[in-house]
Amino acid sequence: HLVESKGGAIACMFLALFFLGTWPALLTMLERRGRLPQHTYLDYSITNFFAALLIAFTFGEIGKGKPDEPNFLAQLAQDNWPSVLFAMGGGVVLSLGNLSSQYAFAFVGLSVTEVITASITVVIGTTLNYFLDDKINKAEILFPGVGCFLIAVFLGFCRFNSSNASDNKAKLSNYTSDYKEVAISSKESDLVKSKDLERGSSSADNVEAGTAVFLLELEERRAIKVFGKSTLIGLALTFSAGLCFSMFSPAFNLATNDQWHTLPNGIPHLTVYTAFFYFSISCFVIAIILNITFLYHPVLNLPKSSLKAYLADSDGRIWALLAGLLCGFGNSLQFMGGQAAGYQQQSLCRHFLCKHFWGVLLFGEYRRSSRKTYIC
């Protein structure tokens, strides 16, 4: 069953906005509560792939297949490997982008990371899809808007980054050393109380967000330690993620529409469900390989882990599994909408506002910051 109406496409995209805007908040929550990102991402990857299988075997098999739109299982046996490779390439870059952004969240925050990655995705992804979709929209309207969007966000980020760093430095410098010792000495009891990640909370949960006490408690508890590290690390990760995100939609576009005519004569284009299946396979494989590697060879001074430790780490697993489902269903919905309305619209329909909302509401980003930071 394919979405063909504009109304159905819009509904898919709006639902995708919520799903894709929510799952990063769950990963951020777990990292801030001390769960290793490798463990979280492995759980997330499993249900993300499960969502793709569920979509393929349900929506991909509904209705009677047509010669130019075969059902999912029928299409698996066809000679469509050029399109399959495009779909799998899209899955690889999406997996790399998601992995980079997971670490960037710790350095520059959920809201800032998503604004920057979304702006890069809009500019590059929309430009590529504009040419792939045979220039169906007016370039003189499309490109000045997305270009100005990127410039404004980049300049705003640079100003915010400098101002926010100054805010945090001022908060910590005004925090007396005696008070630090008292706060840190009480941390062990706080950690015991927060062992249950679904219900537990430490003192950092009860301290007002944005204060020096909050920053110190959060740093002590979180998995990725950021004190003493440059925010340029987060900036580099953010831009890497944005470049990866900007490529997966054009790759998926090529997989489903074959604009470069790589398929043999008589072979139908991949349906969105078949393409998403192959897309998710490569996304899953890359995620598993990299995160198992990171268990034994961690990055950013994270502690070493193992498969045995991962399997035993059930704290917060339900949230990581939920994040994978939200991402998997969200991606399928945005691709279904993009197939009907055009992948330019799908690239423009970004979900950073939802993520920005969660960053401010759940994690207190920008709380008790200076007027300069709020203006940025």
From Swiss-Prot:
Record topological domains on the Cytoplasmic side = 31-41, 102-103, 159-231, 296-317
Stretches of the chain found on the membrane's Extracellular side: 1-9, 63-80, 125-137, 253-274, 339-376
> Keywords in UniProt for this one?
ATP-binding, Membrane, Nucleotide-binding, Transmembrane, Transmembrane helix, Transport
Family annotation (InterPro entries):
UPS_plant, Ureide_permease
Q: Which GO terms describe its cellular component?
A: membrane
Residues reported to bind ATP: 223-230
Q: Which family does it belong to?
A: Belongs to the plant ureide permease (TC 2.A.7.19) family.
Q: What is this protein called?
A: Probable ureide permease A3
